[in-house]
């Protein structure tokens, strides 16, 4: 009995048999997924919503102000994290049985840091796209200038060739 190394391909390829003659014969792509979906056993949603720290059961260590100075708050949390790590080292040396409280505090600080950073992700994405688009515009302007320069050079060469041929 012969067995194949790989299973046969799914029958979807038959939907594209006339594609070379008629590209419109291919089936339409499926509609975009809306709401929640399951992928590799995990539930995901298509909505980009950053859950609040309270929803995650973590105390918020920075103000809930809408005019939050992210830079100062990140610095403050970073200093607090460094202090708590040093305190953890002291606790591990002096009172090893009390390390769990310090670990919980450090975990809370890390979660607050991550939440602040994740709240800046949309701004980062916009800034990155703006930068990429500006680079593309600059590259295209350089390409246009290069084409213009080469066109002028070609026109000059043609003019010189014409004058050379005309002078004979």
Swiss-Prot record:
Database matches in PANTHER family: MEDIATOR OF RNA POLYMERASE II TRANSCRIPTION SUBUNIT 7 (PTHR21428:SF11)
Coiled-coil stretches: 64-92, 132-166
Organism: Arabidopsis thaliana
GO terms of biological process kind: de-etiolation; regulation of transcription by RNA polymerase II; regulation of unidimensional cell growth
The encoding gene: MED7A
Protein's name according to its UniProt entry: Mediator of RNA polymerase II transcription subunit 7a
Main localization of the protein described in the UniProt heading: nucleus
Pfam families linked: Med7
Function in brief: Component of the Mediator complex, a coactivator involved in the regulated transcription of nearly all RNA polymerase II-dependent genes. Mediator functions as a bridge to convey information from gene-specific regulatory proteins to the basal RNA polymerase II transcription machinery. The Mediator complex, having a compact conformation in its free form, is recruited to promoters by direct interactions with regulatory proteins and serves for the assembly of a functional pre-initiation complex with RNA polymerase II and the general transcription factors.
Keywords for the protein's UniProt record, in alphabetical order: Coiled coil, Nucleus, Transcription, Transcription regulation
Keyword Coiled coil: yes
Protein family according to the UniProt entry: Belongs to the Mediator complex subunit 7 family.
Complex formation: Component of the Mediator complex. Interacts with MEE14/CBP1.
Gene Ontology CC terms: mediator complex
């Amino acid at each position: 009995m012969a067995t194949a190394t790989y299973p046969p391909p799914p029958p979807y390829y038959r939907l594209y048999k006339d594609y070379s003659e008629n590209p419109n014969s291919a089936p339409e792509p499926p509609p975009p997924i809306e709401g929640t979906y399951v992928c590799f056993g995990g539930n995901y949603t298509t909505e980009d919503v950053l859950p609040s720290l309270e929803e995650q059961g973590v105390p918020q260590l920075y103000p809930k102000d809408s005019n939050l100075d992210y830079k100062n708050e990140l610095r403050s949390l970073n200093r607090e994290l460094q202090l708590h790590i040093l305190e953890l080292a002291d606790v591990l040396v002096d009172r090893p049985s009390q390390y769990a409280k310090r670990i919980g505090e450090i975990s809370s600080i890390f979660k607050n840091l991550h939440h602040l950073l994740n709240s800046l992700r949309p701004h980062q994405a916009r800034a990155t796209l703006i930068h990429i688009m500006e680079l593309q515009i600059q590259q295209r302007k350089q390409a246009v200038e290069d084409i213009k320069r080469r066109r002028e050079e070609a026109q000059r060469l043609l003019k010189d060739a014409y004058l050379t041929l005309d002078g004979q």
